[in-house]
Amino acid sequence: MLNISIAIDGPAGAGKSTIAKIIGNKLNIMYINTGSMYRAVTLMALKNNIEPYDIESLKALINSMNISFNGNNIIVNGKDLEEDIRMPIINNNVSKYAAVEEVRELLVSMQQNISKKYNVVMDGRDIGTVVLKDAPYKFFITASAEVRAKRRLKELEEKGINISFQDVLKEIKERDYIDSNRKVNPLKQSKDAILIDTSNFTIEEVVDKICNIIKRD
């Protein structure tokens, strides 16, 4: 399989990361969770008391971050941050940092460089519209806010994080609003992307649907 790139976009909690991860394994191509990159920047910014409006400090921070992936886990400067970036404080702040134009420019450049070297499946908010505009396969994965909140709540409970359904739903809706209304690369479906609503489908059914479309070509 040569020069293949698969773009998977969608709102928070739609299941796109899980779906992209399985597709990467099935097709034996590199999976890049671009959301993890924004989460890692958010984590490092909070640790260093850097506010979203402090552009120069944010740029310096990102340029000091050596980002790589070990399987599905994000590694920054040699440290595995996968568990740290899934904490509620990151969920509540990531959209603010991801909305900063300079942050997006630097991370998009990193993501595009990776796609030039490897066959990739990437998931995020602006993969099909910005990062991999010329990807031959584009999918927009969505589900109702309530379904997404239930999924996210289950994930958090499995990690021992105690939070109410209403709080998770509120967070999902707030992130949807910020992601869809930001000035730079807002969340939207690419015109040539295939829309898949996962509300009434299992992860396995969605993966099979996408893999069948790719293998058909």
UniProtKB/Swiss-Prot annotation:
Catalytic activity: CMP + ATP = CDP + ADP; dCMP + ATP = dCDP + ADP
Gene3D superfamilies (alphabetical): P-loop containing nucleotide triphosphate hydrolases
GO molecular function per UniProt: ATP binding; CMP kinase activity; dCMP kinase activity
Location in the cell: Cytoplasm
Binding site for ATP: 10-18
Pfam families found in the cross-reference section: Cytidylate_kin (PF02224)
GO biological process terms held by the UniProt record: nucleobase-containing small molecule interconversion; pyrimidine nucleotide metabolic process
Keyword line: ATP-binding, Cytoplasm, Kinase, Nucleotide-binding, Transferase
GO cellular component, as recorded: cytosol
EC category: transferase
Family under the similarity heading: Belongs to the cytidylate kinase family. Type 1 subfamily.
UniProt-recorded name of the protein: Cytidylate kinase
Native species: Clostridium botulinum (strain Langeland / NCTC 10281 / Type F)
